[in-house]
Regions:
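Short, compositionally biased strand/turn segments
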Residues: 1, 50-60
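Hydrophobic ligand-binding cavity/cleft-lining segments
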Residues: 1-48
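Generic structural detector for well-ordered beta-strands
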Residues: 15-19, 54, 62, 75, ...
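Hydrophobic pocket/interface hotspot
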Residues: 25-29, 61, 76, 87, ...
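Solvent-exposed alpha-helix faces
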Residues: 30-34, 81, 149
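Hydrophobic-ligand binding "helix-grip"
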Residues: 37, 43, 51-52, 66-116, ...
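A conserved amphipathic terminal alpha-helix motif
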Residues: 125-156
């Protein structure tokens, strides 16, 4: 029996320059994600009040709802402040937490000056999202653009 080969999808890649030193850019992205993450981008039944990235490799990445509930999004794969964080995105192609479905979001922070930092985001292994991976990739491509705009405004 022949297996169907998996078609590799191009990663979503975004780059922006923010008005911040590299340490603050990293901290606001990781430790204050809930302050800029759009409230509409939630997977829980209760309205989103915070997004938490536990500051260590192996830490959790999750949202907290108004009712105190926690909904998993993934895990921290690499924690290298203030230069890099790699997150395991464990939301499947239907935006539900699935520990068996792992795509990766890598964010690199590069100081360009005292108050300027380049932020490079790559969301890869999108073919792992299943049958509707191509459609989800397009949603992520536009979604990450808007999300990073909100992040940049938080730093301005």
């Amino acid at each position: 029996m022949m297996s169907t080969p998996t078609i590799k999808l191009a990663p979503v890649q975004k780059t922006l320059v923010v008005k911040s030193d590299v340490e603050r850019a990293f901290t606001v992205f990781t430790s204050r994600m809930g302050s800029w993450w759009p409230r509409s981008h939630s997977t829980a039944s209760s309205p989103l009040v915070d997004v938490i990235v536990e500051p260590r490799a192996g830490g959790r990445w999750y949202e907290r709802g108004e009712d105190g509930s926690e909904t998993e999004w993934g895990k921290v794969l690499r924690w290298e402040p203030p230069a890099k964080v790699v997150l395991a995105w464990q939301l499947d192609g239907r935006w539900k937490y699935n520990p068996a479905c792992v795509t990766e979001v890598e964010i690199n922070f590069t100081a360009l000056g005292a108050q300027q930092t380049r932020v490079d985001l790559e969301h890869r292994h999108l073919e792992r999202l299943g049958d509707n991976a191509s459609a989800v990739r397009e949603l992520l491509n536009s979604g990450w653009g808007g999300i990073l705009d909100l992040y940049a405004k938080q730093l301005a």
